[in-house]
Curated annotation (Swiss-Prot):
GO BP field: formaldehyde catabolic process
Record's catalysed reaction(s): S-formylglutathione + H2O = formate + glutathione + H(+)
EC number(s) reported in the record: 3.1.2.12
Homology family: Belongs to the esterase D family.
Annotated organism of origin: Escherichia coli O1:K1 / APEC
Name assigned to this protein: S-formylglutathione hydrolase YeiG
InterPro entries: AB_hydrolase_fold (IPR029058), Esterase-like (IPR000801), S-formylglutathione_hydrol (IPR014186)
Source taxon at top rank: Bacteria
Entry annotation: catalytic residues: S145, D223, H256
Amino acid sequence: MEMLEEHRCFEGWQQRWRHDSSTLNCPMTFSIFLPPPRDHTPPPVLYWLSGLTCNDENFTTKAGAQRVAAELGIVLVMPDTSPRGEQVANDDGYDLGQGAGFYLNATQPPWATHYRMYDYLRDELPALIQSQFNVSDRCAISGHSMGGHGALIMALKNPGKYTSVSAFAPIVNPCSVPWGIKAFSTYLGEDKNAWLEWDSCALMYASNAQDAIPTLIDQGDNDQFLADQLQPAVLAEAARQKAWPMTLRIQPGYDHSYYFIASFIEDHLRFHAQYLLK
C-alpha cells in the first residue's frame, strides 16, 4: 500500500491510498477518514459508495461528512466506483465502463477480467482495512445513486455483515430502468434471470425476515432522474410487503447533486451510529 495524500481534518486524518487489487487485477485507490482516537476501543466503519462518473474523492471533498464522523468516532471508507487503468475495458458513455462499475461481478468479456467490484467490496477491501487500520469489525454501508444501488445490494446479499444501510437517490430497480438495463446487458449478458441477483427490489422480495436491517433512504423531489431511473416507491412497496424496516424520506426541492447529500449526510451518520456504536 502507498499513501498518496494525508490531511489533518477535525482532529482526525483524511487519507488517500493506492493498493494492488488481486480481485480487480489493477491498482485501486480508496480514501479513508480516521476520526480522532477516543480510547482503546477500535472504531466502527461506514463504507460509502459513490455514483456514476465518480471516484473515491467526490464524497471526501463535497459531502462534508468528516465533522460529524469525527464527533461520533466513525471511520469513513470511500472506495473507487470501478477498476481503472489503460488495460481495463472502458466505454465512451458516462454510464458504462470506468467510473460505472455498478458494484457487481461482470460475467461477459471483456468486462469479466476486471469488473468484480462486488467481490472487492465484500472481501478484499474490508480485509485490507481490517489488517492495515485499527478498526472494529462492525460496519455499515451507504451510497448515492449507482452507489445507493451498491449499498442496498451489498446489505441484501450479505445478511449479518452490516448493522444498517442507507442511500441517497438510489437506483433501486436496475432491471427496469435505462441505466440498469444498459449496464446489466453489457456486464451480465441478455439472461435477465441473472440480473435479478443484482436488483434491490428482487433481493428484498426474496429476503428472510430475520435478515432485515434498519434502512434509510433520502430522495429529492426535484431530482431530474427520479421518474425515469430511480423510482424509490418500487422499493418502498417491496419493503412494505416484506415488513422491512425502511424509512423513505422525500425531500422537497432537492436534486441529484452533492448539495443534496451534504444537506442530509449528518442525519445518515447519526442513523448509522445508533447501530454501529451499540
